């Protein structure tokens, strides 16, 4: 069995199919890992969800911020943005099974056999892998509970609190956990988030740095596959870390990683650009 991890799809199905064909992916025996942001801004969000749902037994995916945004819009907790390409999903006759599958995806997946973690944005430097798994489970439980889901989606948006505190409770607690796993790029050594800066490593505000760069990071030595940060262009120069968002939706490329061998393949995505790219890399 081969395990392949792929960076942010964002509704770009054709490049994914291109990569899977190149490795002769067989859903009967192989596994596809996805770092989240399955939908939005690309031209094939509905087709992408349908493709993944059809082979869901062979797919392991975590949730990204765009996936959570889709759930919020679907539950009327948020409005569609001008740049969203989600309307086809919302109007699809099969939207309910697709959205139900989506909300049951985890924020963090850990493969015990390979000792590899899969997340969308990252793990804050002050958390061990064990604590990260426990915190992710708190949000996952809210997403999967019919009564708690609307309350979570209503309160999910926002940049505060900017830092974890074990005394946090309710929606504030869930919001900061969600922001760590799905929106984080820069933070302080003790985990205070800056969610405004979205470009390359040299654009960190004073006192902030990429979440993975701190010598004291408690997941140092762990293998972590993540996406979200297209400006990294697939490089973070940290042993054991694999950055897979290579900006497909913005006209760059989609990247596939053989989890066992470390080999990477990329597919050009120049034709996938749906809206014009803004001046800054998107959240």
From Swiss-Prot:
Cellular compartments per GO CC: cytoplasm
The entry's keywords: Hydrolase
- EC numbers listed for it are 3.6.1.41
Which reaction is the catalytic activity of this chain? P(1),P(4)-bis(5'-adenosyl) tetraphosphate + H2O = 2 ADP + 2 H(+)
Q: Which Pfam families match?
A: Metallophos
> Family assignment?
Belongs to the Ap4A hydrolase family.
Looking up PANTHER family in the UniProt record yields: CYTOCHROME C5, PTHR40942
Question: Which function does this protein serve?
Answer: Hydrolyzes diadenosine 5',5'''-P1,P4-tetraphosphate to yield ADP.
The molecule here is called Bis(5'-nucleosyl)-tetraphosphatase, symmetrical
Organism field: Pseudomonas aeruginosa (strain ATCC 15692 / DSM 22644 / CIP 104116 / JCM 14847 / LMG 12228 / 1C / PRS 101 / PAO1)
């Amino acid at each position: 069995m081969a395990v392949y991890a792929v960076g942010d799809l964002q509704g770009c199905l054709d490049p994914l199919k291109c990569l899977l064909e190149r490795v002769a992916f067989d859903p009967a025996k192989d596994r596809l890992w996805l770092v989240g942001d399955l939908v939005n801004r690309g031209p094939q969000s509905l087709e992408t969800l349908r493709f993944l749902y059809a082979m869901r037994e062979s797919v392991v995916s975590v949730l990204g911020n765009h996936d959570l945004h889709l759930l919020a819009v679907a539950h009327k907790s948020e409005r569609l943005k001008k740049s969203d390409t989600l309307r086809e999903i919302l109007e699809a006759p099969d939207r309910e099974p697709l959205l139900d599958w989506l909300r049951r995806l985890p924020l963090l997946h850990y493969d015990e056999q390979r000792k590899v973690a899969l997340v969308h944005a990252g793990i804050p430097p002050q958390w061990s892998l064990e604590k990260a798994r426990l915190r992710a489970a708190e949000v996952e439980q809210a997403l999967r509970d019919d009564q708690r889901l609307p309350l979570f989606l209503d309160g999910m948006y926002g940049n505060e609190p900017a830092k974890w505190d074990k005394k946090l409770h309710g929606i504030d607690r869930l919001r900061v956990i969600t922001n760590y796993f799905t929106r984080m790029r820069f933070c302080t050594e003790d985990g205070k988030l800056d969610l405004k800066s979205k470009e390359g490593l040299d654009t960190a505000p004073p006192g902030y740095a990429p979440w993975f760069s701190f010598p004291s990071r408690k997941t140092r030595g762990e293998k972590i596959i993540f996406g979200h940060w297209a400006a990294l262009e697939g490089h973070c120069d940290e042993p054991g870390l694999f950055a897979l968002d290579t900006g497909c939706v913005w006209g760059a490329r989609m990247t596939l990683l053989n989890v066992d061998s470390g080999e990477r393949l990329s597919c050009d995505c120049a034709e996938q650009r749906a809206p014009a790219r803004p001046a800054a890399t998107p959240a």
